Design a protein with these regions (language model features):
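A glycine- and small/hydrophobic-rich beta-loop-beta segment
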Residues: 1-56
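Internal helix-turn-beta structural module
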Residues: 10, 39-158
């Protein structure tokens, strides 16, 4: 279908772009409204701290909770579930359930966010609205490529 083809092309562009090592699909469920689902997913997917933890292979649920907290979405920390899975697997590795860290081995959590593609599953457990956002990690190569050069006036335009 056309949507699938467009999504795969967008992911290919991401994989080819400026030092990206991970493509992440954020699946947000259990929001009170579509607007909340969108706001929460965007907040996580656009968070510099979350993106850098992805690059480091760190399944840092604290940064995800932080990003959810400053989104415009209604979030009750004690209800949030967070899990990761390989994009080609339906097996979710939970790092947080009902706002509490799981006893999942750290190595298993790290394996779920290895380079390539993975899915991040966040359930706010408040309602029925869902959202999906595609994001990428933030690497030194990306920063170096985009930082500009104040000694080169040509870099000021882009």
């Amino acid at each position: 279908d056309l949507n699938h083809v467009c999504l795969e092309l967008a992911k290919m562009i991401g994989r080819d772009g400026e030092g990206i090592t991970r493509i992440v699909t954020v699946h947000l469920t259990g929001a009170n409204s579509n607007a909340d689902a969108d706001a929460a997913a965007r907040s996580v997917g656009n968070s510099t701290l979350v993106k850098t933890s992805w690059y480091g292979g760190d399944p840092n649920w604290g940064r995800i909770i932080d990003a959810l907290g400053y989104s415009d979405a209604t979030v009750v920390e004690e209800k949030v579930d967070i899990a990761s899975s390989a994009s080609d697997s339906h097996k979710k590795i939970f790092s947080l359930r009902q706002g509490r860290p799981t006893e999942t081995a750290f190595g298993s959590l790290c394996k779920a966010v290895e380079p390539g593609e993975f899915d991040l599953h966040i359930n706010l457990n408040l309602g029925k609205a869902t959202g999906v956002l595609h994001a990428a990690d933030l690497t030194e190569e990306y920063v170096d490529f985009n930082k500009g050069d104040i000694k080169d006036p040509a870099s000021l335009g882009g």
